[in-house]
Amino acid sequence: MNDKVYNNDCENSCCYKTTIVYNESNNKTSKSSYTGATHTRFEHSLGVYRVALLILKRLAHDERFAALVRAEEAETLILAALLHDVGHFPFCHLLEDLKLPGLIRHEEAAASYLLGELAPTIRADWNVDPEDVCAVLGKRAPKRRPTDSDAEYSRREIVFRLLASILSGPIDVDKTDYLLRDSCAAGVPYGKNYDVERLVGSVCLNERGDGIAISTKGKTAAELMVFARYVMFSEVYWHHASRSATVMFQRAVDLIAQDVPTERLIADFRRLSDAEIAAYLLQLTRPANSPSTCNSAENSPFLADATLADAGFNDFADFNDETAPRSPADARRRDARRLLLGLFGPERRLFKRVRQFSVLEEPTLYPRLAGRPYFELREISERFAASLGVPGRLLVDAPPVDKEVEFKIDVFYPEENVYRPLATVSPVVRALAQEQFDDYVKRVRVFAAPEVASTLRLIPDFNARFARAVDEFEADARR
């Protein structure tokens, strides 16, 4: 299997058999790792597997690591790297933010695959306990075995913390691959401008021995990786067009979920590909008198060979602005269809930025919005849109609390035999990860439909009226 990102082959018989099962069982449905790019989670998983092998090869020369970690535990890390995304499905993170009833998080879905249909392959080809793989992926302590002494179980707890830090942490195998891969696939240079080989070559154990650190050799490479992640967030992941598409898609699914049983919606999302989901959602939003409309668990289709052309773009004429919806359900379908056609239709029509601000620009309003769950932002959006006379045509996007440019890793100075936090020895990292990221990348944005955006931008007291909508929401929430 040739990997275009690293320009080399990834070959191993156990890896090959496991990935065949993995790809056939789950990841064939999840095409895009980043929605605007053209690559798959399957490719990404092979890349993470490759980086994990490189780090293990490096750490094999570390005396403390060699004395601590057993061969089967190293195999557990390799398998966890290969299967770390097995629970994902198309648009997974966007849907999880909606908190739909019955939707289990991708971590739980991964455990069901690992302990279910993948378990025989894992045991036969890897001689690894699937529960240990789940523990590493979930950053949990391993299950205590009947033969474990107190000392042995204590050692295993340390090992599993170490393995989890290699897979998911400030500098880990997942980020190392997705920054490069997303950058290549999206056609931008930002995620490629750091020295992966030098960074991997500097990896060592931290002072406690339960996580990774880097030596001074990798300090500059680590700084450049932090910078790469900062710029990728600024110019790709949280670019205003990306965020507009995100909130439009979430709102469309939210509207549909009010009329379609969520258990069927979730089941169909798990088995459909990206393109099939687009066609499926468009069919769900056809007018009520359309014979292909499906609004119940019994007639919700599995569109194995669906195309966007099958979804009836011409039916949008039934939802023109002059036609009053016959029911609240009609209105929801109309609004959802507008959003979906803006995303997946013949001509892209994303909602436009009307306002955006950081915590520096709006120190009072910003913290009242940042970190709010989706359903609260939806309620605020609806109130604000109604107050401006544009119901259904305004969406609020605010940064979540769990996204940061992580940098909490130590740098080892062998000449002095001391460890120092990267943020302490690198003002560049501190400025990027705290000041620049928090102050400039993490912005609150208000998007509006293209036909009303220009008018809304001219409202002189826009932010004050926005604040009043938040006031009203908070007052009602306290009642």
Regions found by a protein language model. Name each.
Residues 1-78, 86-479:
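Histidine-centered, transition-metal-coordinating active-site segments
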Residues 83:
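Aromatic-lined, polymer-binding surfaces characteristic
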